[in-house]
Amino acid sequence: MAAPILKDVVAYVEVWSSNGTENYSKTFTTQLVDMGAKVSKTFNKQVTHVIFKDGYQSTWDKAQKRGVKLVSVLWVEKCRTAGAHIDESLFPAANTNEHLPSLIKKKRKCMQPKDFNFKTPENDKRFQKKFEKMAKELQRQKTSLDDDVPILLFESNGSLIYTPTIEINSSHHSAMEKRLQEMKEKRENLSPTSSQLIQQSHDNPSNSLCEAPLNISRDTLCSDEYFAGGLHSSFDDLCGNSGCGNQERKLEGSINDIKSDVCISSLVSKANNIHSSPSFTHLDKSSPQKFLSNLSKEEINLQRNIAGKIVTPDQKQAAGMSQETFEEKYRLSPTLSSIKGHLLIHSRPRSSSVKRKRVSHGSHSPPKEKCKRKRSIRRSIMPRLQLCRSEGRLQHVAGPALKALSCGESSYDDYFSPDNLKERNSENLPPESQLPSSPAQFSCRSLSKKERTSIFEMSDFSCVGKKTRTVDITNFTAKTISSPQKTGNGEGRATSSCVTSAPEEALRCCRQAGKEDGCPEGNGFSYTIEDPALPKGHDGDLTALEGSLEEMKEAVGLKSTQNRGTTSKISNSSEGEAQSEHEPCFIVDCNMETSTEEKENLPGGYSGSVKNRPTRHDVLDDSCDGFKDLIKPHEEMKKSGRGKKPTRTLVMTSMPSEKQNVVIQVVDKLKGFSIAPDVCETTTHVLSGKPLRTLNVLLGIARGCWVLSYDWVLWSLELGHWISEEPFELSHHFPAAPLCRSECHLSAGPYRGTLFADQPVMFVSPASSPPVAKLCELVHLCGGRVSQVPRQASIVIGPYSGKKKATVKYLSEKWVLDSITQHKVCASENYLLSQ
């Protein structure tokens, strides 16, 4: 260690690199400590010397204010080498930021990593306070613990060593006993457990028959497996999963003893009148007794309704048939089938009530119609679509009872169940629409996507925009619809008021007209389209546009099946034939609404009904003209992409990145150009930041482009549009630019210069600079001819190492570049390469 030559010095070191990213204070701090000086980490009143270099302005000002000696790092080095305390005035510190304005604050960011010191209570005051607080809290918890509370001991890995289970169980039981005693004193209702319920059912089976399923379903509701199953669980899922298995085994003994047919039949009749909710969520969460009291109130209301002659033999018949439907639907196991009477109240989905109504409707309908309906249900892809085909007769009969019950049970319904979707939609409708006058009106349902596609394929869309006619779409025959019914003569003529120009809008109008129509046969779909091909008063069928099908798909936006060649046919028979599964056809009736005068003027071949005379109307070539006009913009859009991209490109050269970013932003704002890295066939403008002769400038001159300065972009941005280029053309530096540009504008076809047209064949050396490809392109653009081999050429451009001929000129690359710049062939004598 050196001698303590600076023992009276208390120094504060602030030494940074000139760019303010590196802090070198630590090195000089070590040297000062070695020489016996004290180094302060902060600038306090004890500091006598400040070693300063490129430090903070505040440190400089503070040192000058206090009169502390400001020295440079050279003073420290001189003291170390001389081994003595050198005079500070010989090495004053310099402040480079002193003359800079005070508004500019120089940011400092040291790139050296900090020394990481692990926090301990000894070296960190905040950590020490937190540690002391935790120790006090732990001591307080230890003193407040009772003797009977067990103390749990843990190993280092976190596993439990000692757990006094006897004390835990005893304290748990004592707490339970206290709670039970309190509830008895307050006379609160105690919910019986499952074992107590089974014991009560053995003692009094007739009374507990309705109570046990309620509590069982509540236990099932509270089980984890039920909640994991979701809300859309069916009866099989709820009663067949693992969550109900324990309850099923517990109940087997008691259920086998319960064989009272009277009670089961009464409960089935009760379930017939009560619209049960689709899940167990209708149970009251307070206690089963409260729900039983609510149920008893509903039974009283039901008995009053029964006394008022609301229940009819039709309902009894519906009850029996609904029970059979329920058994067939869910295939109950032998154990559960014995208790289906009372589980029917709690777990039957709401759709079963709709099915009951459908079956009761079937009992009143003729056998033939019922067989058709069953056959169509079996054939249907989605049988649930048929649920809405019930009659309004049962709703008329049991209307008051259903209204009274629906008000009481609405809070228990699973509102988001898919079975309730159609009932929710029907609740929003007025009562007149909920009670239809006849069952046939239910066939006027909304069309599926497949049916819509088939209608589009078989429709004549050339009829858009010329002449109005009315099309009545009768009963459609497809897989999801039952066999076609006989069409009547009194078909509805409800015509939509909107004249459409697209098939989708026409179909929407068709649906609206179908809803407004009240015809007995349900032939209510009509929409108005316009047809140029048919004369006034012509009755014919719609034929598919086979020739222009692809155009039709582009215009309408269809993304589905291709045309299968199917055409719409009109049936002569009273009933339509069954359609094949692979090609669904639709019976379309096209009737024109004409006045009596027009009907008198019709030729004989066109008179009569379509049904009696199924003539075929072939689409002529000129009938597609209107439709082709409609889809022409779509074809052009498809060919050219979503939008037209700019055909002109702009190239930047000799331009720094800041200016390039400005140009890119201006081009994005004003549009009309796309940026290209090099000059190509589509380039029209070359922007040069500096008037330097670059390859892009020469290629731009050779192609007849505008060679402009950077100011053109700035002025265009100022005025908000691309302005005239001529004032900003660099014609002074590149005289050939305006000449080539004028020639390019005057040329009829693709522009090619004539500068080297009279010159002999040239060969460009592979060692030339600029590269061979660029030089060859320049010569070609200026009308010259380039050979791939040197023996065919009379001029060789660039350094050539082969055998030289006396008849061949060996010229420098500058000859080509200067000739293009000046737009004249320069004298070759000035560019000859040494032999």
Swiss-Prot record:
Domain BRCT: start-end pairs: 1-93, 640-730, 751-833
InterPro entries in the record: BRCT_dom (IPR001357), BRCT_dom_sf (IPR036420), Microcephalin-like (IPR022047), Microcephalin_mammal (IPR029504)
PROSITE patterns named in the record: BRCT
Modified residue annotations for Phosphothreonine: 335
GO cellular component terms listed in the entry, alphabetical order: centrosome; cytoplasm
Region feature (Disordered): 184-206, 346-376, 418-442, 557-582
Keyword field: Cytoplasm, Cytoskeleton, Phosphoprotein, Repeat
A Gene Ontology biological process term: mitotic cell cycle
Biased composition (Polar residues): 190-206, 559-577
Repeat among keywords: yes
Modified residues (Phosphoserine): 279, 287, 296, 333, 548
Superkingdom of origin organism: Eukaryota
Matches recorded under CDD domains: BRCT_microcephalin_rpt1 (cd17716), BRCT_microcephalin_rpt2 (cd17736), BRCT_microcephalin_rpt3 (cd17751)
Localization of this protein: Cytoplasm, Cytoskeleton, Microtubule organizing center, Centrosome
Biased composition (Basic residues): 346-361
Coarse class of the protein's main subcellular location: cytoplasm
Subunit architecture: Interacts with CDC27 and maybe other components of the APC/C complex. Interacts with histone variant H2AX under DNA damage conditions.
Domain-level remarks: BRCT domain 1 is required to prevent abnormal chromosome condensation. It binds directly to the SWI-SNF chromatin remodeling complex. BRCT domains 2 and 3 recognize phosphoserine/phosphothreonine marks on proteins with high selectivity, and mediate interaction with phosphorylated CDC27. They also mediate the dual recognition of phosphoserine and phosphotyrosine in the C-terminal tail of histone H2AX.
The protein's role, per its UniProt record: Implicated in chromosome condensation and DNA damage induced cellular responses. May play a role in neurogenesis and regulation of the size of the cerebral cortex.
Name this polypeptide is given: Microcephalin
Species name: Gorilla gorilla gorilla (Western lowland gorilla)
Gene giving rise to this polypeptide: MCPH1
